[in-house]
Each structure stands twice: as structure tokens, then as C-alpha cells.
UniProtKB/Swiss-Prot annotation:
This is HTH-type transcriptional regulator YidZ. Belongs to the LysR transcriptional regulatory family. Residues 25-44 bind DNA. PROSITE patterns: HTH_LYSR (PS50931). Residues 8-65 form the HTH lysR-type domain. Involved in anaerobic NO protection.
Length: 319
């Protein structure tokens, strides 16, 4: 017989949503500001209501049953609609609200101060957690550990990082596109030579280890030309490559997005930017669409919709 929602404590659905996000009784309890024992009792009531275990223990935490997986989207939408009713300007800001972002650095650092101010103006008691974008970030968005990702994708047809290769569960919006530049110190000897492909390849390069790979579209384009660069150093972040390229008597070249000019202005690094020595068709393959990414279940989540629009407005000048 069909059960009536009037006999269900709706707080249990919030508990169920948090268990789905956290995959942990302890973590869900912390977010609800209750004891793990209280969450366990709520889970027992939910299991009785749905006549299903809902979650089973696994080495990685709670693993949802097929029934729980089938309810995930509907539950998320129900919670989002509930939040829409509660997210009114004159209502008290919810305690414990978190904004969890995964972003390419220094992309986020350029606007982090402005973004944090806007978040705290609207949600004074919120907390912000920022992690570097890495090979696991898309999975973190899918698992509900990250609200929004902000990162560059690639345009080369053979790249694994194409927008068209994103998982079906991920929605996205391109905020701006960028073509990388070559960054070198202001007194680098290459500045006294003709700037062409031979000069570019004559000097040692700094590579960025991107999603567990030391090569990217630039290396694909060079391979098509039968050429190869000498990678003398591999670093995890663009700002580290810029710092190293700026060191006195350093012959290293860094290839990094054009937007890094804003980062350089903030930190006053003695660097010059030169265009990559390729023709227009090759440059097109090196375009990097900088993209906001989120899970489809959060497409109408008011917190995340607001965060997306706020980030979009902050980076509008770079479009």
C-alpha cells in the first residue's frame, strides 16, 4: 500500500540527502550538528520506511543501493525546491553553509578576494573551501564533494580534455577562451633573437603536470610538425612555472595562459609574454576554454546558481 508523506518526518529526507553526499554517518552528523547515533537512528527509520537498506558498508564508506541511486536525482531536486522556498533575502543565513570549489591556480587566486567578499556579504556565516583542480576533480563534483569546478579544457582534436568528453552528468558554461603565451624573464637571451619555432625549441621548457600528464595540446601540435621541446622541469601549477621562469640567469621558458598577466600584475614578476610561434590553424588547436563545471543535480540549487552567476560576473572582463 502506498505510504503517505504525512507520516514521514521530512527531516529524515535531509538526513538521507547528506548521507548520499557524505557517504559517512559521522560526516553527515557533523553537518547536521547532531551525534552519529542520531543519524544512525534516522537511517534505521528511513530503511523501515523504504523497506530497503539504502546504504551498505564498503571500504570507501557507505555505498548506496540501487534503490538509493534511483532516488538520488529526485531527492536532490526536492531539496533544491525546498531551498528555493527558504532562500529569501530577509531570512536568517543558514549556519554551516559551505562553498566548496575546485579551481585551476592561479585562475581563482586572481579573483579569490573579490569572490570571498561577495560570498560573505550574502552569507556572513559561510565557510569557503578551495582545492586545486586535479585529475580527481570531476569525480569529486560527481560525488558531491565539490560544488563547482573552474578549469581550462582543451581544443586539440586528439585531446582527452575536450568539452565533448565531459561525463554526461556534468553541466558546464564557458566563461572565456584563452590562447597560452610563452613567458620568459625580461633579460632572457631569446629576446635578442628572431622569435620563431627554432628559437622557441632551442631553450629548455617548464611543463605543467596536468591531470597526471606532463604533455598537452602544445606537444601534440609539435608532434604534428615533427618537432619536440626539451622539458627540463615539470611542476604542478602555473604560478610555480612563472616564478621559476622569472629567476635571474634562468634560461627556462614557461608556457601559461594569457590571463596570467593579471597574476603577474599582482605579484610584479619580471616577465615578458610572447605569442606561441605557430600559424592560425595551429593556434586554434591550442585554445583553452575556461569553464565552470557542476553536476546536473545542482542545476537548480539556489546556492550554486548564485555562485555560478557571481563567478561569471567577476570574470566578465576576461571574456
Amino acid at each position: 500500500m502506498k505510504k503517505s508523506i504525512t507520516t514521514l518526518d521530512l527531516n529524515l529526507l535531509l538526513c538521507l540527502q547528506l548521507l548520499m553526499q557524505e557517504r559517512s554517518v559521522t560526516k553527515a552528523a557533523k553537518r547536521m550538528n547532531v551525534t552519529p547515533s542520531a543519524v544512525s537512528k534516522s537511517l534505521a527509520k528511513l530503511r523501515a520506511w523504504f523497506d530497503d537498506p539504502l546504504f551498505v558498508n564498503s571500504p570507501l564508506g557507505l555505498s548506496p543501493t540501487p534503490l538509493m541511486v534511483s532516488m538520488e536525482q529526485n531527492l536532490a531536486e526536492w531539496m533544491q525546491m525546498s531551498n528555493l522556498l527558504l532562500d529569501k533575502p530577509h531570512h536568517q543565513t543558514p549556519r554551516g553553509l559551505k562553498f566548496e570549489l575546485a579551481a585551476e591556480s592561479p585562475l581563482m587566486m586572481i579573483m579569490l578576494n573579490a569572490l570571498s567578499k561577495r560570498i560573505y556579504q550574502r552569507y556572513p556565516q559561510a565557510t569557503i573551501k578551495l582545492r586545486n583542480w586535479d585529475y580527481d576533480s570531476l569525480d569529486a563534483i560527481t560525488r558531491g564533494e565539490v560544488d563547482i569546478g573552474f578549469s581550462g579544457r582543451e581544443s586539440h582534436p586528439r585531446s582527452r580534455e575536450l568539452l565533448s568528453s565531459l561525463p554526461l552528468a556534468i553541466d558546464y558554461e564557458v566563461l572565456f577562451s584563452d590562447v597560452p603565451c610563452v613567458w620568459l624573464r625580461k633579460d632572457h637571451p631569446a629576446l635578442h633573437e628572431a622569435w620563431n619555432l627554432d628559437t622557441f625549441l632551442r631553450y629548455p621548457h617548464i611543463s605543467i603536470c596536468w591531470e597526471q600528464s606532463d604533455t598537452w595540446a602544445l606537444d601534440n601540435v609539435l608532434q604534428e610538425l615533427g618537432r619536440e621541446r626539451t622539458i627540463a622541469m615539470s611542476l604542478p601549477e602555473f604560478e610555480q612555472s612563472l616564478f621559476m621562469a622569472a629567476q635571474p640567469d634562468n634560461l627556462l621558458l614557461a608556457t601559461a595562459p594569457r590571463y596570467c598577466q593579471y597574476y603577474n600584475q599582482l605579484h610584479q614578476l619580471p616577465l615578458v609574454a610572447l605569442p606561441l610561434p605557430f600559424d592560425e590553424s595551429q593556434q586554434k588547436k591550442l585554445e583553452v576554454p575556461f569553464t565552470l563545471l557542476w553536476h546536473k543535480r545542482n542545476s537548480r540549487n539556489p546556492k550554486i546558481v548564485w555562485l555560478r552567476e557571481t563567478i561569471k560576473n567577476l570574470y566578465a572582463s576576461m571574456a
